[in-house]
Swiss-Prot record:
Subcellular location: Membrane
InterPro entries per record: DUF5772 (IPR043921)
GO cellular component annotations of the record: membrane
Record-stated family: Belongs to the IIV-6 357R family.
UniProt-recorded name of the protein: Transmembrane protein 066L
Pfam families: DUF5772
Membrane-protein topology: Multi-pass membrane protein
TM annotation in the entry: 14-34, 48-68
Coiled-coil positions: none
Keyword Transferase applies: no
Length: 193
């Protein structure tokens, strides 16, 4: 496309280049008007390439895809084992769920250690447990955080005295149902006898 002026014929790309250079002299670079004019010039040049030379436009699209793919792989590689990944991981515990198991990973900033706990989905007990103390008050919210996912106190056998109670009554309902009273120094083994 050409434009006829008093001095002769100008092509559209020359007009856009003139407009771009002229706006750079008048408007501050980085301003809103400058950004709009530069965007229009780039869009028009892309349009010219795609319309008049489609094979060049296709090659530019492939080049853009390759550049984006390399940038993504570089970013993943930079973040996978670097200090940036450790900063992101330290903010909160991460729970990874695979098909057959779950893994909980968290960083302890006090001891400067990573803790990883892996457990299978089928191992988690779904039984309902209710704990009552010697005064028949419900103390389940106090004892429940100590139980662990298998509801066995992480393999330990604490006594009611270890937990600060004189006696505990346990009511269990689910796959295994029973009711039992544990005295002060009797180990809390949560399986039926």
């Amino acid at each position: 496309m050409t434009v006829t002026t008093a001095s002769g014929q100008w092509t559209f790309p020359v007009l856009f280049a003139t407009l771009l250079v002229g706006s750079a002299l008048v408007f501050p670079v980085g301003g809103l008007v400058w950004s709009a004019i530069a965007s229009l010039a780039i869009a028009y040049l892309y349009y010219l390439v795609v319309e008049q030379h489609p094979h060049v436009g296709f090659a530019l699209q492939l080049l853009a895809l390759v550049v984006v793919a390399r940038a993504k792989s570089w970013w993943r590689q930079a973040c996978s084992g670097s200090w940036l990944a450790s900063i992101v991981r330290r903010r909160k515990p991460t729970l990874t769920v695979d098909e057959y198991r779950s893994t909980l990973t968290y960083w302890d900033p006090v001891n400067k250690k990573w803790y990883i706990y892996t457990f299978a989905h089928g191992q988690r007990s779904t039984d309902l447990l209710i704990f009552r103390d010697e005064n028949k008050r419900d103390v389940t919210p106090l004892v429940e955080p100590l139980l662990g996912p298998l509801q066995n106190f992480h393999g330990a056998s604490p006594t009611p005295a270890d937990l600060g109670f004189a006696r505990l009554h346990v009511f269990r309902d689910g796959e295994t149902s029973y009711q039992r009273q544990f005295d002060r120094h009797e180990p809390l083994v949560l399986t039926p006898h």
